[in-house]
C-alpha cells in the first residue's frame, strides 16, 4: 500500500460578508472527489471574519499535488487567501 500525505490548509474568505457555510460546501465540492477532506473546522478570526481549517488527505503520487489543491482553492468564489499550515507523509 502506498503512503498518503496529510495537509492542513487555512482558508480565508475575501470579506466578512461571505457565508462561511456556503464557502465550506463550495470548497469541499471543488476538491472532491479527487481530494479527501477529512475534517473542516470554522475558526473565528475577529471583526466578524471566520476562516476554514481544512484537513485533507491524498495519495503520495505524481497525480496529486498541493499546487493543484491551491489552484482549486483560488478558483472558488469567496476565497480571499489560503495558507498551508501542515504537510506530512503518512505511512502505516
UniProtKB/Swiss-Prot annotation:
It comes from the Archaea. Keywords: Elongation factor, Protein biosynthesis. One of its GO terms (molecular function) is translation elongation factor activity. InterPro entries: eEF-1beta-like_sf, EF1B_bsu/dsu_GNE, Transl_elong_EF1B/ribsomal_bS6, Transl_elong_EF1B_B_arc. Pfam families: EF1_GNE (PF00736). Gene3D superfamilies: 3.30.70.60. Promotes the exchange of GDP for GTP in EF-1-alpha/GDP, thus allowing the regeneration of EF-1-alpha/GTP that could then be used to form the ternary complex EF-1-alpha/GTP/AAtRNA. Belongs to the EF-1-beta/EF-1-delta family. This is Elongation factor 1-beta.
Amino acid at each position: 500500500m502506498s503512503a498518503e500525505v496529510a495537509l492542513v490548509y487555512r482558508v480565508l474568505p475575501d470579506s466578512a460578508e461571505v457565508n462561511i457555510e456556503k464557502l465550506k460546501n463550495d470548497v469541499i465540492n471543488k476538491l472532491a472527489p479527487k481530494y479527501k477532506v477529512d475534517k473542516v473546522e470554522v475558526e473565528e478570526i475577529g471583526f466578524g471574519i471566520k476562516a476554514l481549517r481544512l484537513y485533507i488527505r491524498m495519495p503520495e503520487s505524481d497525480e496529486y499535488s498541493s499546487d493543484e489543491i491551491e489552484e482549486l482553492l483560488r478558483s472558488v468564489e469567496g476565497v480571499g487567501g489560503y495558507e498551508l499550515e501542515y504537510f506530512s507523509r503518512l505511512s502505516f
